[in-house]
């Protein structure tokens, strides 16, 4: 609304707009309440008037000639009214937003919280929960494991020691094998000499 004031020294009137703060506060103070109901399949809170769309899109639920997924009763034409009346104990009401001309600190915190809930509401309506910014404990464990320093040096030293031990044992086996080969050669030579000696003895006896 506007109020008119007369200037000094003249008859000209100038319209100066004024605001009816009482009316503005009454309009701004009217909060809109939204009704939510948990989905019977995925338990995500969905607005009542979006529940049918959510069931059809997310869970392929045929609303035509279907029964209520909660109470198994036949659904009427007004499915929203059915959920509001028959399952009122499942409904949750939330404020959409609030506004005041000079908000205090508590009112400011409340307004910011309700504003966040207002922006998160579409994700609930579409059946997709708002993303959680808290880190996943499983991922944090993997990250900590990847950043941790390697502790393979003792294992490597043990493996090297085992390798040296195996190589030394192989050398010892080769030496023993060589000694055995030398002994077998000596035995073979002795046998050949004995055979040759026996042949000579036989030849001499035959000659006489």
From Swiss-Prot:
InterPro entries named in the record: DI19, Di19_C, Di19_Zn-bd
Biased composition (Basic and acidic residues): 153-163, 170-190
Domain of life: Eukaryota
Coiled coil: none
Pfam families recorded: Di19_C, zf-Di19
Region (Disordered): 151-190
Family: Belongs to the Di19 family.
Protein name (Swiss-Prot/TrEMBL): Protein DEHYDRATION-INDUCED 19 homolog 6
Lineage: Eukaryota, Viridiplantae, Streptophyta, Embryophyta, Tracheophyta
